[in-house]
Amino acid sequence: DLPPKTYVKRYFDLSKDQRDLYEELRHNYRSDMFGGALTVESTLARITRLQQVAGGFAPTDEEKTPRRIGEKRPRVEALLDVLEEYGGKAIIWARFTAEVDEIAAALKRAGISYVRYDGEVDVDDRRVAKDEFTQGDARIFLSKTSCAGHGLTLIQATTVIYYSNNYSLDQRQQSEDRAHRKGQTRNVTYVDIVANDTVDQRI
């Protein structure tokens, strides 16, 4: 039998700049809702934009370069606090490429060894990254659930951190199983980083 899973939520408050923009968007979206102007597709798009704000970026289409909101990065600070609290190797999952970029920069500044495994890394380098995590000294495996949530065995990790989530239950379950599968002998802790009073609490 596999060891148990432990689930933890780490809450933080948005910066003032984030909160102001978040509330402005939420007010506008509620007005659209009462006006009957929303479809399922447009509702999901609005939720995505709110999630971008909660992540520290102004709403944008995913293919465009996002703009940071203000100077404070409370979600990053929450992540670093979690890494300080939980030792050993860890997997960090994020939804947006801009978030992965920001996490990578924060890890580098903090002197925390990591590998990146997502669409910004070519296939050969991904293989090297995986080996550096599973067999080498890299402490952090940084990726997106949409890129690495299936097929990989990463049982060296005892902590799995969801910097942000999407609405795919399959991707969530599969990404959890990267560390919790045959060969794992230790308890695995799953930490969700959640912005207070935002869509994070509904995902």
Question: Which stretches of residues belong to each language-model region?
Answer:
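Conserved Helicase C-terminal RecA-like lobe
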Residues: 2-152
